[in-house]
């Protein structure tokens, strides 16, 4: 059972027999009863309810009693890998030999559609501009792209995100000429398919990063409120950059952030979450890009 996003993620998955669309009219407080009704209707032997399994259980919701725990206590209690926790929550046995690598499944039409955005004679870099929450956006991402374009003209940058990310794409980048801007222009599945084809993915904590985690594609992951342990511990070829606690003392907070302007300390320069704006200097990400780029030559 899932919504439109769930259908996109699970499309073509051979392990999924049937996808039941979530009824958006069901109130949150009645979800338990609704799922029990679906179990009976579809004659299911077992229910694994992932509602609030990670969100609220690990990422603390403002209504949670642990939301206001001191940071060190919060980290000690909740800095746990999401994939491992979902296995525990589902009462599935696992140990150090379990393969937690995520999987996506694309048909040939989707792969062909994604491939047409590549430039075969270039080093293709897929850049995710934002995540589901505004606090995940890295405000210097287009500046990073501009710097890369200035020093590495053979790099072709592909930017992806939702319609709101077009605002970021419109930032002036005079040295960035080898770029394809696709925010709001292509389906999420095509963005996810691209993570298997490009030379490098640069992304904050987003679905795009989890998609890249399915493949050995090198990836630079930017973390403000979350950590490498929580998100990408089981990914291969991942180069995590954690916000500097000296620059953003709140990071990592491991909290559910719905409204950064109410929940987060804000950067004076961008009026956005301090962990991403001030905690991750542009030069730090650029240096990591150069390191990964040179290693791949």
PLM regions: where:
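Catalytic machinery of carbohydrate-active enzymes
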Residues: 1-297
């Amino acid at each position: 059972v899932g919504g439109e996003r769930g259908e996109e993620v699970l499309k073509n998955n051979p392990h999924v027999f049937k996808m039941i669309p979530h009824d958006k009219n069901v109130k949150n407080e009645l979800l338990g009863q609704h799922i029990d009704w679906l179990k009976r209707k579809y004659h299911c032997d077992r229910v694994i309810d992932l509602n609030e399994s990670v969100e609220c259980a690990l990422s603390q919701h403002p209504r949670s009693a642990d939301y206001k725990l001191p940071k060190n206590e919060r980290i000690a209690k909740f800095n746990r890998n999401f994939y491992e926790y979902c296995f525990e929550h589902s009462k599935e046995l696992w140990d150090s030999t379990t393969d937690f690598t995520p999987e996506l499944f694309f048909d040939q039409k989707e792969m062909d559609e994604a491939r047409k955005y590549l430039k075969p004679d270039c080093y293709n870099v897929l850049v995710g501009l934002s995540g589901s929450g505004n606090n995940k956006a890295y405000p210097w991402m287009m500046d990073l792209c501009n710097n890369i374009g200035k020093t590495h003209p053979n790099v072709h940058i592909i930017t992806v995100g939702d319609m709101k990310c077009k605002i970021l794409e419109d930032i002036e980048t005079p040295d960035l000429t080898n770029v394809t801007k696709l925010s709001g222009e292509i389906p999420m599945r095509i963005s996810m398919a691209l993570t298997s084809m490009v030379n490098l993915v640069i992304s904050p904590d987003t679905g795009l990063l989890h998609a890249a985690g399915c493949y050995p594609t090198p990836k630079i992951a930017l973390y403000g409120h979350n950590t490498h342990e929580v998100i990408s511990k089981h990914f291969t070829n991942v180069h995590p950059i954690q916000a500097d606690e000296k620059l953003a003392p709140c990071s990592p907070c491991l909290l559910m952030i719905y409204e950064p302007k109410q929940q987060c300390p804000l950067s004076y320069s961008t009026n956005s979450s301090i962990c991403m704006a001030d905690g991750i200097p542009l030069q730090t990400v650029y240096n990591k890009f150069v390191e990964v780029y040179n290693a791949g030559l």
